[in-house]
């Protein structure tokens, strides 16, 4: 049997070509895809992390102290949920001081009615959904220690700052129970994200902040009942796939803030934007950061 010169050349060519391919790396593992570009946000500060691993995914002035607006109420809830022997079904009687506070400060309200009896659990809904400063006041009055309302409120704010210290939130300080501060109510995107991540460990908090709307039955002064309806100010719920919370904030100095979280395919990203330029832009900023976070987490 003859092996022609052409056959030998063809065989040699195949060997040479295969060697060249291997040498060129064509058959080796493909290179990693290019990293997605970091998003541009209108907010002056932003931070995102993988909630499971704690890995930082995005920063923009993440450690610059800024006014927090009603995102302060995450700490209000955290202090309540951290109370020993907490009874979420214990009742609180709504005081006139709470409604007077709303009127005096033109503050966001859960529309609590003087004389009604509401549970601590219901106050948490009133705190986190409509961002009720009256609910925040009621909780501070309930869980602060002291013989006067002023003393109890001062003590509760002290508990907020102690909790911040215990959570190693080095750039955070509170001088109010609701975010209507006196110049010393501040935090950072990183610190607020860490606070939210810690507070999300409480199942009650997780349930509350993912709720779009609720109707709560409360006891009236006369012993009857009425229903209180509250809707969540967080526009991410129902508009961003996997959104699970957590809290909006706004104010003259704070502008527009949002602490946010979402879960997709078993992975949760959580973050904060502070001092955005509008309610719409803070939501857009958050969506951009979560989209990016899920790509790089």
What is the meaning of each model-derived region?
Residues 32-190:
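Active-site-adjacent loops and short helices of periplasmic peptidoglycan-processing enzymes
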Residues 6-7, 70, 279:
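Short alpha-helical segments used as structural interaction elements across diverse proteins
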Residues 1-33:
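Secretory targeting and sorting signals
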Residues 10-11, 74, 264, 268:
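Hydrophobic alpha-helical segments, especially transmembrane helices
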Residues 34-45, 144-297:
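Penicillin-recognizing serine hydrolase domain
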């Amino acid at each position: 049997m003859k092996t022609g010169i052409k056959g030998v050349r063809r065989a040699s060519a195949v060997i040479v070509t295969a060697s060249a391919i291997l040498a060129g790396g064509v058959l080796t593992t493909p290179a990693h895809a290019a990293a997605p570009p970091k998003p541009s946000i209108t907010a002056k500060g932003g931070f995102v992390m993988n909630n499971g691993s704690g890995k930082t995914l995005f920063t923009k002035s993440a450690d610059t102290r800024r006014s927090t607006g009603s995102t302060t109420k995450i700490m209000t809830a955290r202090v309540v949920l951290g109370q020993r022997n907490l009874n979420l079904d214990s009742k609180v009687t709504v005081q006139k001081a709470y409604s007077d506070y709303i009127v005096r400060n033109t503050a966001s309200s859960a529309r609590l009615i003087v004389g009604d009896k509401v549970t601590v659990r219901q106050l948490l809904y009133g705190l986190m959904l409509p961002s009720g400063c009256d609910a925040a006041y009621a909780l501070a009055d309930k869980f602060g220690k002291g013989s006067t309302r002023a003393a109890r409120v001062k003590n509760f704010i002290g508990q907020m700052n102690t909790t911040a210290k215990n959570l190693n939130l080095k750039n955070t300080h509170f001088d109010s129970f609701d975010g209507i501060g006196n110049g010393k109510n501040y935090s950072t995107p990183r610190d607020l994200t860490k606070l939210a991540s810690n507070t999300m460990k409480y199942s009650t908090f997780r349930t509350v902040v993912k709720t779009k709307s609720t109707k709560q039955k409360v006891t009236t002064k006369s012993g009857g009942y009425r229903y209180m309806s509250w809707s969540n100010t967080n526009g991410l719920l129902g508009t961003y796939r996997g959104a699970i919370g957590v809290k909006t904030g706004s104010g003259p100095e704070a502008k527009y803030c949002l602490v946010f979280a979402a879960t997709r395919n078993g992975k949760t990203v959580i973050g904060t934007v502070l001092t955005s330029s509008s309610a719409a832009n803070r939501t857009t900023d958050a969506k951009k950061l979560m989209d990016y976070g899920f790509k790089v987490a």
